[in-house]
Amino acid sequence: MKIPAMKNEHLIALVGNPNCGKTTLFNALTGSRQRVGNWPGVTVEKKSGEYRHDGLRFEVVDLPGTYSLDVVDREVSLDESVARDYVHGNEAELVVNIVDAANLERNLYLTTQLVEMRVPLLVVLNMVDVAQAKGLAIDVEALAHKLGCPVVPVVASEGRGVDALKAA
C-alpha cells in the first residue's frame, strides 16, 4: 500500500502477535539493534526508528506484541494495552501487521480485527522459510484479495523481502 507522497515524513506502526518477528523486522528496516528474544513480552514499550526510501523519511514504531485489540473489560497486560491504545488512537498512517507464516491461523485473528477497523493496512508474512519447511504453501495473492490489503512475504531474520516491503 503506497503512502501518499504529500509530505516527506510518514509514521508506520508494526503490530502483531508476540514472537512473530516484529522487532526483527524493525531492526531490518531501521538498522537498529533492538533486543530480540524468543519469548513473549520482550518489547514492553513502543520503540521507534527510521529509514529512508525514495527520498521520503519513514518513522517506524515497534509496538509490543498482542493477540487482540479488543477494548472489552478483560485483564490485559501492560504491553497489550500499549499496542491496543496506539492502534485505536489512529496515530499511524500505515499499520504493518506482522504475521508468523508458520502459524497463520492463530495470527490472522488480530489481522481480521485490523481489517474490521479499516486502518490503512499492509500484512507482512514473516518466516515464510519456516512455513515452507513445514510443508505449508500460502497463496499470497489469494490472501491479499481475501483481506483487501497488500501482503508481502519476508524472512526478516535474513533481510529477504525487506526491499520489496519498503517499495510496497
Each predicted region: which residue ranges?
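Conserved nucleotide-binding/hydrolysis micro-motifs of P-loop NTPases
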Residues: 32, 41, 65-67, 101-105, ...
